[in-house]
Amino acid sequence: MAEVDWIHRHPKAEDLRVGLISWAGTYLTFEAYKSSVTASAKSLGRRQTWELLVSNEHESQAVIRLKSLQGLYLLCEADGTVCYGRPRTSHHGCFLLRFHRNGKWTLQCIISGRYLESDGEDVFCNSRVLSAYHMWTPRPALHVHVILYSPIYHSYARADHTVGRIWVDAAIPCLEECGFLLHFQDGCYHLETSTHHFLSRVDRLVPQRSSQTAFHMQVRPRGLVALCDGEGGTLYPQGSHLLLGMGSAPMKGEEWFVLQHFPTWVSLKSKSRRFLSVIYDAEVCAASERLTQMSLFQYECDSETPTLQLRSANGYYLAQRRHRAIIADGHPMESDTFFRVHWNCGKITLQSPNGRFLGIASDGLLMANVTIPGPNEELGIRFANRPFLVLRGRYGYVGSSSDHDLLKCNMDQPDCIQLLPCRQGIYHFQAQGGSFWSITSFGTFRPWGKFALNFCIELQGSSLLTVLAPNGFYLRADRSGTLLADSEEITKECIWEF
């Protein structure tokens, strides 16, 4: 079977959400208990996150609605007040969104012609004369661990630490070098690589964040972004090797990237400690003792149902075929590509659409031929493209603060949790300074332990997981902002985006 071109997936709804920052540095906020919209929040959370619904788009403007995560829309009334609810007419809640050269947005009510503005606390639509008070800075609300895809070159950005550069030449985003952390600070963005280096304005990777690593971001609906220096320079792929560098003359569209959440790639090991790999273009066999690109699988799982699709680096999905064989030749919507996943202490068993479990046959091939699973059908699973985790829960990111000695779960800026694999599904959590996570008798955590502890990770979706702590309880985001391990059951507060 010939390898297919890697098909770039369109951004998901969560990749297209934004926060809107007023001239005063505060966020447009959905206030459920006040039945109103304000701009008083200092950080980006669930109530400050808005989905853009685009009905018409041109180069410098678009007609949009803003929808909150609660399912209600931003509405401008005839008297200039701004509230939320459901549109009463086809134009109610529609805004003309204009993109300005400085990266700011303005939102003009389609019905009244008045601009959305804030006084730093309240939000209203009173004036038809444009001013600085009507400017809003868009901030992408997706998880900070991202990939950058060039729709012009059909390739992904990749950090090359051997030469300290970033190239836009990766056909498949399966390596950790394709992942970047997008830090937002003082209105600018810093692009951090998987080895914790930063892209600078002189096109090289440097070890420290500084003014030379700060970029302004142009944001468009549908997940498009461009990074620039604010002085006429823009980042875009250059030369025959597509070096990501600063320049002033990109060809039309070269500077735009699709910003998406970093996908999850895993490796799977049989009981004989051999990697599952795609061989002869399509057969899946547990034969390799060495990890190769054909041993990597993109983990695509619906968080609402325990069904899993595994996408091989050849562009196809694992599927059950004739004679119960598992072949990497499936397509996205085929029913034979959906497997039921069962977790057990960091390992998984996979159940095919015919109800049988996947196991390794005597010739090493992966087959769906077992009715009652046992240890031989368990597969060890490990992250293949993530040397660290960045966890985001219901109240913010997991991180440390100089004001608290305990790890918090409501931070705007995250800490990186270095992963030290111990056994399949079991990891040690290491803090940024090289110390380990330690747990107190109250189920709270400190980031300066001397000894490594075991944490069990189980995937709950394509980019969702739960963590079983050393005390036998699940990690939970508490409303107070303290990270706790005190939950016997998996609740919404135990689900972490990574």
From Swiss-Prot:
Tissue expr: Expressed in testis.
Cytoplasm in keyword set: yes
Annotated TM spans: none
The keyword Cytoplasm is assigned to this record: yes
Keywords assigned: Actin-binding, Cytoplasm, Cytoskeleton
Segments forming a coiled coil: none
Main location: cytoplasm
GO biological process, one term: actin cytoskeleton organization
Entry's localization field: Cytoplasm, Cytoskeleton
GO molecular function per UniProt: actin binding; actin filament binding; protein-macromolecule adaptor activity
GO cellular component labels: actin cytoskeleton; cytoplasm
Family according to the record: Belongs to the fascin family.
Record PANTHER family: FASCIN, FASCIN-3
Purpose of the protein: Acts as an actin bundling protein.
Protein name (Swiss-Prot/TrEMBL): Fascin-3
Species of provenance: Mus musculus
